[in-house]
């Protein structure tokens, strides 16, 4: 190859990612929508585990359904305030947030889990190697799109495996051991 062409070739590192559902994984699940800062309570061990995953060179990407927006229960600004709070508390450790604001009662969306569009967008944006990546969720619908795309799946809070979970952990502190770190 001629030296004059060498600068035209760009080599991209394939990134590994850790996808996380939000409510019930990062912050306390309330049973209703979490959109007020006073209700956005980061669960124990979350920040330590995220820091360790970052040290292991994982991209950290939150994938969350936020149907309360389309139902008029809260605004994107309120949701973003919760995400900004998480970033402040974690020293900006999350690489990106993907959210699906629609609810089936209002409008169908391929972004909304269990569909996979939010994952596909992140994979394309960050050149993610799905075979080296993980998704953690507390519901089967969190795991379905990841499994469809070849991402290893972890269910949290369940003592038994579902057909969509590759790993099962009691709480987030068990994630690193489950995946061999």
Name every feature range the model reports, one short phrase each:
Residues 11-59:
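Active-site neighborhood of HAD-like aspartate-dependent phosphohydrolases
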Residues 77-96, 104-135, 139-181:
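Asp-based, Mg2+/Mn2+-dependent phosphohydrolase catalytic module
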Residues 25, 67, 140:
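Short glycine-rich anion-binding loops that position phosphate/pyrophosphate groups of nucleotides
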Residues 27-30, 63-66, 98-100, 120-123, ...:
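A short alpha-helix capping/helix-coil boundary motif
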Residues 2-22, 95, 181:
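Non-catalytic pre-domain segments flanking phosphatase-related domains
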Residues 50-83, 94-103:
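Substrate-recognition element of Asp-dependent hydrolases with the DxDx(T/V) motif
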Residues 26-44, 69-78, 92, 102-110:
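Metal-dependent phosphoesterase signature
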Residues 20-22, 64, 137-138:
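Active-site flanking residues adjacent to catalytic metal/cofactor-binding acidic residues
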